[in-house]
Protein backbone atom coordinates (compact mmCIF):
# COMPACT_ATOMS: atom_id res chain seq x y z
CA UNK A 1 0.00 0.00 0.00
CA UNK A 2 2.82 2.37 0.88
CA UNK A 3 4.48 1.64 -2.46
CA UNK A 4 1.28 2.61 -4.30
CA UNK A 5 1.13 5.85 -2.30
CA UNK A 6 4.73 6.69 -3.21
CA UNK A 7 4.03 6.07 -6.90
CA UNK A 8 0.92 8.28 -6.78
CA UNK A 9 2.81 11.02 -4.94
CA UNK A 10 5.64 10.89 -7.48
CA UNK A 11 3.15 11.08 -10.35
CA UNK A 12 1.44 14.11 -8.79
CA UNK A 13 4.77 15.87 -8.31
CA UNK A 14 5.70 15.20 -11.94
CA UNK A 15 2.31 16.45 -13.13
CA UNK A 16 2.64 19.65 -11.08
CA UNK A 17 6.12 20.16 -12.48
CA UNK A 18 4.86 19.73 -16.03
CA UNK A 19 2.00 22.15 -15.40
CA UNK A 20 4.25 25.03 -14.39
CA UNK A 21 3.02 27.86 -16.60
CA UNK A 22 5.13 30.98 -16.94
CA UNK A 23 3.38 34.31 -17.36
CA UNK A 24 5.73 36.12 -19.71
CA UNK A 25 4.75 39.55 -18.40
CA UNK A 26 1.30 39.06 -19.94
CA UNK A 27 2.69 39.12 -23.47
CA UNK A 28 1.07 37.34 -26.40
CA UNK A 29 3.35 34.41 -27.38
CA UNK A 30 5.22 34.83 -30.67
CA UNK A 31 5.03 32.51 -33.67
CA UNK A 32 7.89 31.90 -36.10
CA UNK A 33 8.33 35.65 -36.60
CA UNK A 34 10.49 37.55 -34.11
CA UNK A 35 8.53 40.15 -32.16
CA UNK A 36 9.45 42.91 -29.73
CA UNK A 37 9.19 41.64 -26.16
CA UNK A 38 7.46 43.53 -23.35
CA UNK A 39 7.71 47.07 -24.71
CA UNK A 40 7.90 49.56 -21.86
CA UNK A 41 8.81 46.86 -19.31
CA UNK A 42 11.87 45.04 -20.67
CA UNK A 43 12.37 46.75 -24.03
CA UNK A 44 12.55 50.38 -22.94
CA UNK A 45 14.47 53.56 -23.70
CA UNK A 46 17.35 52.11 -21.65
CA UNK A 47 20.16 50.25 -23.39
CA UNK A 48 19.25 46.60 -22.76
CA UNK A 49 22.39 44.49 -22.41
CA UNK A 50 21.13 40.95 -21.91
CA UNK A 51 18.08 38.89 -22.70
CA UNK A 52 15.61 38.38 -19.85
CA UNK A 53 16.15 35.18 -17.85
CA UNK A 54 13.12 33.64 -16.15
CA UNK A 55 13.36 31.31 -13.18
CA UNK A 56 12.00 27.78 -13.83
CA UNK A 57 9.05 28.46 -11.51
CA UNK A 58 8.18 31.60 -13.48
CA UNK A 59 8.26 33.81 -10.39
CA UNK A 60 11.36 35.89 -11.19
CA UNK A 61 12.89 37.54 -14.22
CA UNK A 62 16.24 39.35 -14.41
CA UNK A 63 18.06 41.22 -17.16
CA UNK A 64 20.72 43.90 -17.48
CA UNK A 65 20.84 47.40 -18.92
CA UNK A 66 23.43 50.10 -19.54
CA UNK A 67 22.78 53.39 -17.81
CA UNK A 68 23.82 56.63 -19.44
CA UNK A 69 26.01 58.57 -19.20
CA UNK A 70 29.03 56.37 -18.61
CA UNK A 71 27.69 53.03 -19.85
CA UNK A 72 27.23 51.79 -16.29
CA UNK A 73 25.84 48.22 -16.37
CA UNK A 74 23.26 47.12 -13.80
CA UNK A 75 21.03 44.08 -13.30
CA UNK A 76 17.28 44.51 -12.79
CA UNK A 77 14.72 42.13 -11.30
CA UNK A 78 10.94 41.70 -11.37
CA UNK A 79 8.90 39.26 -9.26
CA UNK A 80 5.52 37.62 -9.85
CA UNK A 81 3.33 37.51 -6.75
CA UNK A 82 -0.43 37.41 -6.16
CA UNK A 83 -1.13 37.33 -9.88
CA UNK A 84 0.90 40.37 -10.90
CA UNK A 85 4.45 41.45 -11.65
CA UNK A 86 6.33 43.92 -9.46
CA UNK A 87 8.06 46.97 -10.84
CA UNK A 88 11.70 46.56 -11.80
CA UNK A 89 14.28 46.98 -9.04
CA UNK A 90 17.88 46.15 -8.18
CA UNK A 91 18.18 42.62 -6.74
CA UNK A 92 19.48 42.36 -3.18
CA UNK A 93 22.78 40.80 -4.34
CA UNK A 94 23.64 43.81 -6.51
CA UNK A 95 26.60 46.08 -5.93
CA UNK A 96 25.25 49.29 -7.44
CA UNK A 97 28.74 50.80 -7.65
CA UNK A 98 29.99 47.92 -9.80
CA UNK A 99 29.35 47.04 -13.42
CA UNK A 100 27.13 43.94 -13.34
CA UNK A 101 25.69 42.14 -16.35
CA UNK A 102 24.53 38.86 -17.93
CA UNK A 103 22.42 37.13 -15.26
CA UNK A 104 21.92 33.41 -15.87
CA UNK A 105 19.95 30.84 -13.86
CA UNK A 106 21.13 27.30 -13.27
CA UNK A 107 18.58 24.90 -14.85
CA UNK A 108 17.18 23.99 -11.41
CA UNK A 109 16.71 27.68 -10.53
CA UNK A 110 18.66 27.37 -7.28
CA UNK A 111 21.56 29.59 -8.32
CA UNK A 112 22.07 32.73 -10.36
CA UNK A 113 25.35 33.43 -12.11
CA UNK A 114 26.40 36.89 -13.28
CA UNK A 115 29.42 38.94 -14.32
CA UNK A 116 30.68 41.77 -12.11
CA UNK A 117 33.76 43.93 -11.59
CA UNK A 118 33.02 44.28 -7.86
CA UNK A 119 35.89 43.84 -5.43
CA UNK A 120 36.34 40.18 -4.43
CA UNK A 121 37.45 38.55 -1.21
CA UNK A 122 39.78 40.19 1.31
CA UNK A 123 43.36 40.51 0.04
CA UNK A 124 42.12 39.76 -3.46
CA UNK A 125 44.98 40.60 -5.79
CA UNK A 126 43.06 39.91 -8.99
CA UNK A 127 40.31 42.53 -8.85
CA UNK A 128 40.66 43.92 -12.37
CA UNK A 129 37.90 43.38 -14.90
CA UNK A 130 34.64 41.46 -14.77
CA UNK A 131 34.55 38.03 -13.20
CA UNK A 132 31.88 35.39 -12.59
CA UNK A 133 29.88 35.33 -9.38
CA UNK A 134 27.14 33.09 -8.00
CA UNK A 135 24.20 33.86 -5.69
CA UNK A 136 21.89 31.25 -4.16
CA UNK A 137 18.12 31.60 -4.17
CA UNK A 138 16.89 31.74 -0.56
CA UNK A 139 13.10 31.82 -0.59
CA UNK A 140 12.20 35.09 -2.30
CA UNK A 141 15.63 36.61 -1.67
CA UNK A 142 19.28 35.98 -2.55
CA UNK A 143 22.38 34.96 -0.63
CA UNK A 144 25.53 37.05 -0.58
CA UNK A 145 27.28 36.32 -3.91
CA UNK A 146 30.50 34.31 -3.97
CA UNK A 147 33.28 34.50 -6.54
CA UNK A 148 33.57 31.38 -8.68
CA UNK A 149 36.65 29.19 -8.57
CA UNK A 150 39.81 31.16 -9.36
CA UNK A 151 40.58 28.68 -12.15
CA UNK A 152 37.71 30.41 -13.93
CA UNK A 153 37.45 33.90 -12.47
CA UNK A 154 40.79 35.43 -13.42
CA UNK A 155 39.36 38.65 -14.86
CA UNK A 156 37.71 39.18 -18.24
CA UNK A 157 34.80 36.72 -17.84
CA UNK A 158 31.41 37.82 -19.08
CA UNK A 159 28.32 35.93 -20.31
CA UNK A 160 27.91 32.38 -19.02
CA UNK A 161 25.50 29.46 -19.27
CA UNK A 162 25.19 26.36 -17.09
CA UNK A 163 24.18 22.83 -18.05
CA UNK A 164 22.03 20.60 -15.83
CA UNK A 165 25.19 18.76 -14.73
CA UNK A 166 26.80 22.06 -13.72
CA UNK A 167 29.21 22.37 -16.64
CA UNK A 168 29.98 26.01 -17.30
CA UNK A 169 30.23 27.73 -20.68
CA UNK A 170 31.47 31.31 -20.56
CA UNK A 171 33.14 34.10 -22.49
CA UNK A 172 36.66 35.30 -21.87
CA UNK A 173 37.79 38.54 -23.46
CA UNK A 174 40.54 40.97 -22.59
CA UNK A 175 39.45 44.60 -22.31
CA UNK A 176 39.22 46.26 -25.75
CA UNK A 177 40.51 43.09 -27.44
CA UNK A 178 38.68 41.97 -30.64
CA UNK A 179 39.50 38.35 -29.82
CA UNK A 180 36.84 36.98 -27.46
CA UNK A 181 36.36 33.24 -27.02
CA UNK A 182 33.94 30.75 -25.49
CA UNK A 183 35.39 28.38 -22.90
CA UNK A 184 34.00 25.30 -21.11
CA UNK A 185 34.76 24.07 -17.61
CA UNK A 186 33.51 20.71 -16.32
CA UNK A 187 31.87 20.47 -12.93
CA UNK A 188 33.06 17.63 -10.69
CA UNK A 189 31.16 17.64 -7.39
CA UNK A 190 31.30 21.41 -7.19
CA UNK A 191 34.89 21.73 -8.37
CA UNK A 192 35.59 23.19 -11.80
CA UNK A 193 38.25 21.89 -14.17
CA UNK A 194 40.64 24.23 -15.94
CA UNK A 195 38.65 25.93 -18.73
CA UNK A 196 39.22 24.76 -22.28
CA UNK A 197 38.73 26.89 -25.37
CA UNK A 198 36.07 25.37 -27.64
CA UNK A 199 37.12 24.37 -31.16
CA UNK A 200 34.17 26.33 -32.60
CA UNK A 201 35.87 29.67 -31.86
CA UNK A 202 37.07 31.75 -34.80
CA UNK A 203 39.93 34.25 -34.98
CA UNK A 204 37.45 37.03 -34.19
CA UNK A 205 34.70 37.64 -31.67
CA UNK A 206 32.56 35.01 -29.92
CA UNK A 207 30.37 35.90 -26.95
CA UNK A 208 27.06 35.26 -25.21
CA UNK A 209 26.94 31.45 -25.05
CA UNK A 210 23.68 29.68 -24.25
CA UNK A 211 23.93 25.93 -23.83
CA UNK A 212 20.89 23.64 -23.71
CA UNK A 213 20.49 22.06 -20.25
CA UNK A 214 21.43 18.66 -21.72
CA UNK A 215 24.18 20.24 -23.87
CA UNK A 216 22.51 19.16 -27.13
CA UNK A 217 23.05 22.56 -28.72
CA UNK A 218 24.94 25.80 -28.17
CA UNK A 219 23.90 29.28 -29.36
CA UNK A 220 26.35 32.18 -29.41
CA UNK A 221 27.03 35.51 -31.10
CA UNK A 222 29.89 36.13 -33.50
CA UNK A 223 31.19 38.45 -36.20
CA UNK A 224 32.73 35.52 -38.09
CA UNK A 225 32.50 34.89 -41.81
CA UNK A 226 28.95 33.99 -42.73
CA UNK A 227 27.39 36.85 -40.78
CA UNK A 228 24.67 38.81 -42.55
CA UNK A 229 25.97 42.18 -43.69
CA UNK A 230 29.23 41.76 -41.78
CA UNK A 231 27.47 42.32 -38.47
CA UNK A 232 27.29 40.35 -35.23
CA UNK A 233 24.86 37.46 -35.71
CA UNK A 234 23.57 34.52 -33.70
CA UNK A 235 25.00 31.11 -34.61
CA UNK A 236 24.10 27.60 -33.45
CA UNK A 237 25.94 24.29 -33.34
CA UNK A 238 24.70 20.85 -32.34
CA UNK A 239 26.35 18.02 -30.43
CA UNK A 240 27.23 15.17 -32.80
CA UNK A 241 27.02 11.48 -31.94
CA UNK A 242 30.76 11.48 -31.27
CA UNK A 243 30.34 14.23 -28.68
CA UNK A 244 31.89 16.93 -30.85
CA UNK A 245 30.21 20.17 -31.86
CA UNK A 246 28.98 20.55 -35.42
CA UNK A 247 30.19 23.41 -37.60
CA UNK A 248 28.52 26.64 -36.38
CA UNK A 249 25.56 27.66 -38.51
CA UNK A 250 24.07 31.13 -38.96
CA UNK A 251 20.56 31.06 -37.47
CA UNK A 252 19.15 32.73 -40.57
CA UNK A 253 17.04 35.74 -41.45
CA UNK A 254 14.17 34.86 -39.12
CA UNK A 255 16.52 36.11 -36.41
CA UNK A 256 19.53 37.82 -37.95
CA UNK A 257 19.47 41.05 -39.96
CA UNK A 258 22.14 43.47 -41.16
CA UNK A 259 21.97 44.81 -37.59
CA UNK A 260 23.61 43.25 -34.53
CA UNK A 261 21.85 40.27 -32.90
CA UNK A 262 23.12 39.22 -29.48
CA UNK A 263 22.27 37.88 -25.98
CA UNK A 264 20.52 34.60 -26.89
CA UNK A 265 18.57 32.81 -24.14
CA UNK A 266 15.94 30.06 -24.32
CA UNK A 267 13.10 30.15 -21.80
CA UNK A 268 13.17 27.47 -19.05
CA UNK A 269 10.14 25.71 -20.54
CA UNK A 270 11.97 25.50 -23.87
CA UNK A 271 9.22 27.32 -25.75
CA UNK A 272 10.82 30.65 -26.69
CA UNK A 273 14.13 32.08 -27.82
CA UNK A 274 14.94 35.58 -26.57
CA UNK A 275 17.62 37.77 -28.12
CA UNK A 276 18.73 41.39 -28.39
CA UNK A 277 18.85 43.39 -31.61
CA UNK A 278 19.57 47.00 -32.51
CA UNK A 279 17.52 46.75 -35.73
CA UNK A 280 15.12 49.45 -34.52
CA UNK A 281 17.71 51.93 -33.27
CA UNK A 282 17.74 55.52 -34.46
CA UNK A 283 20.18 58.38 -34.09
CA UNK A 284 18.09 59.75 -31.23
CA UNK A 285 17.44 56.34 -29.67
CA UNK A 286 20.44 54.00 -30.10
CA UNK A 287 20.84 50.60 -28.51
CA UNK A 288 19.24 47.18 -28.27
CA UNK A 289 15.69 45.98 -27.77
CA UNK A 290 14.69 42.47 -26.75
CA UNK A 291 12.89 40.19 -29.21
CA UNK A 292 11.43 36.71 -28.88
CA UNK A 293 10.45 33.95 -31.29
CA UNK A 294 9.07 30.43 -31.04
CA UNK A 295 11.96 28.11 -30.17
CA UNK A 296 10.81 25.59 -32.78
CA UNK A 297 13.32 27.36 -35.03
CA UNK A 298 16.06 25.43 -33.20
CA UNK A 299 14.63 22.08 -34.28
CA UNK A 300 14.20 23.40 -37.83
CA UNK A 301 17.88 24.29 -37.92
CA UNK A 302 18.82 20.89 -36.51
CA UNK A 303 16.91 19.07 -39.27
CA UNK A 304 18.68 21.16 -41.89
CA UNK A 305 22.08 20.78 -40.23
Task: Give the ranges of each region predicted by the language model.
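Bacterial Sec-dependent N-terminal signal peptides
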Residues: 1-18
Amino acid sequence: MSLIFIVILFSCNQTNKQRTIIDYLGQKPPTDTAELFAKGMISTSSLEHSAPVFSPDGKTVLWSIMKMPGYHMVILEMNYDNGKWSSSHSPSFSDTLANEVYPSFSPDGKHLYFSSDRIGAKNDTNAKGNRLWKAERTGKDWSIPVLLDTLISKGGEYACSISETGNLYFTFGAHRSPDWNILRSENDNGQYSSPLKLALNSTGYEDGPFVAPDERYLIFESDRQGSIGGSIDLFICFKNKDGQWSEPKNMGDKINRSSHERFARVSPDGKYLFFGSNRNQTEKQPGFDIFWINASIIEELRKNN
